[in-house]
């Protein structure tokens, strides 16, 4: 995390960005997030990138989760049924995998406003066990933006019942305009119309 936050902010010493006043100070430097909405509610778009090895969403990672990610309005969402290789206790998904899904939908919620960011802080509450082989839905959304400091929230729900299985909050450091352009070009990022059902299970935005 240390090297990622330093790279995102482009200056030494920004690893303290998660510590209150230091966050505000580091966020005041460089470009603020654009805030340009690229997805509107009810118009679900699929996030497409070049093949890569991200554990959460990379097509080239044979051990990964292979999440399909979508944005709808100001949120990112995904649905997946976790296979046995992600087991913790018998029949239950490992907590680290749940954290990964929550982090991923929060990180990509920034794409709904044409931004990219790196995780500075993540807090997770586990509500109920996540069963293997059963479809779950992850949803992440932005709660506030202060210059380049973006606060987010997320949850994992059972789409059949609406029961909340896990929740999270996180802080991201948004990339400046030059770094964002570099990343978008490297990964050939684009948003395309999604055939998937974008219906949210409700809840806070």
Please provide the spans of the model-predicted regions.
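HotDog/MaoC-like acyl-thioester-processing domains
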Residues: 1-45, 130-132, 143-205
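Catalytic strand-loop segment that frames the active site of acyl-thioester-processing enzymes
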Residues: 3-4, 50-93
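Hydrophobic beta-strand-centered segment that forms part of the acyl-chain substrate-binding groove
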Residues: 23, 29, 104-137, 142-143
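Hydrophobic core residues within well-ordered beta-strands of beta-rich domains
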Residues: 65, 118-120, 136, 150, ...
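Short beta-strand micro-motifs enriched in acidic
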Residues: 70-72, 141-145
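A conserved beta-turn-beta hairpin within the catalytic core of GNAT-like acetyltransferases
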Residues: 77, 115-117, 148-150
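Residue-level recognition of well-ordered beta-strand positions that form the cores
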Residues: 79-81, 123-125, 139-141, 155, ...
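Conserved N-terminal beta-strand and adjoining loop/helix that marks the start
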Residues: 96-100
């Amino acid at each position: 995390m240390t090297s990622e936050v330093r790279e995102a902010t482009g200056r030494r010493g920004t690893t303290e960005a998660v510590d209150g006043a230091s966050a505000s100070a580091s966020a005041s430097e460089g470009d603020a997030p654009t805030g340009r909405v690229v997805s509107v509610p009810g118009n679900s778009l699929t996030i497409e990138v070049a093949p890569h090895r991200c554990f959460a969403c990379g097509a080239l990672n044979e051990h990964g989760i292979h999440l399909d990610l979508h944005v709808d309005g100001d949120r990112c969402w995904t649905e997946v049924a976790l296979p046995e290789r992600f087991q913790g206790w018998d029949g239950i998904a490992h907590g680290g995998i749940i954290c990964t899904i929550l982090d991923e939908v929060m990180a990509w919620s920034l794409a709904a406003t044409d931004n990219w960011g790196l995780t500075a802080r993540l807090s997770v509450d586990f509500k109920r066990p996540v069963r293997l082989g059963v479809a779950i839905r992850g949803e992440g959304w932005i709660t506030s933006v202060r210059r380049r400091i973006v606060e987010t929230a997320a949850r994992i729900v059972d789409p059949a019942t609406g029961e909340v299985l896990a929740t999270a909050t996180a802080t991201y450091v948004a990339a400046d305009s030059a770094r964002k352009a570099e990343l978008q070009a490297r990964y050939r990022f684009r948003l395309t119309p999604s055939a998937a059902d974008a219906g949210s299970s409700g809840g806070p935005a």
